[in-house]
């Protein structure tokens, strides 16, 4: 069974839409195999988004991700990576299809409500970043 990582970002946590977002996952066949609410440190955010270190938005992304708590979860199901990405919608909420998480809950391309792994390989890396094996069930 495929697994993917999801992060409900600070903007969506602050808006109080955690339950609505989790319901989208579950009602579309994704099981929550693990979940926790965390306040990322600057170092954690920098390490998690290290792939973007040379990009002009890196500093703002890190600052945003540490601006409040996030909800990190492992979603499990058939085609979990692609299913989650379809549910999230385009990175820019203005381009996201109606009914997607970002179209419904995101504020901007920066405060875009959710993160999801973009491949099985990255899902494995991202899951290991946040979860110990005994936390996944």
Swiss-Prot record:
Q: List the disulfide bonds.
A: none
- The lineage's top-level taxon is Bacteria
The family database entries (HAMAP family) matched by this protein are listed as: NDP_kinase
Single GO MF descriptor: nucleoside diphosphate kinase activity
**Predominant location:** cytoplasm
Cellular component terms (Gene Ontology): cytoplasm
Q: Which CDD domains match?
A: NDPk_I
Which residues does UniProt mark as catalytic? 115
Q: Which cofactor does it need?
A: Mg(2+)
Q: Which InterPro entries match?
A: NDK-like_dom, NDK-like_dom_sf, Nucleoside_diP_kinase, Nucleoside_diP_kinase_AS
Record organism: Campylobacter jejuni subsp. jejuni serotype O:2 (strain ATCC 700819 / NCTC 11168)
* Protein's recorded name: Nucleoside diphosphate kinase
Gene3D superfamilies given in the database record? Nucleoside diphosphate kinase-like domain
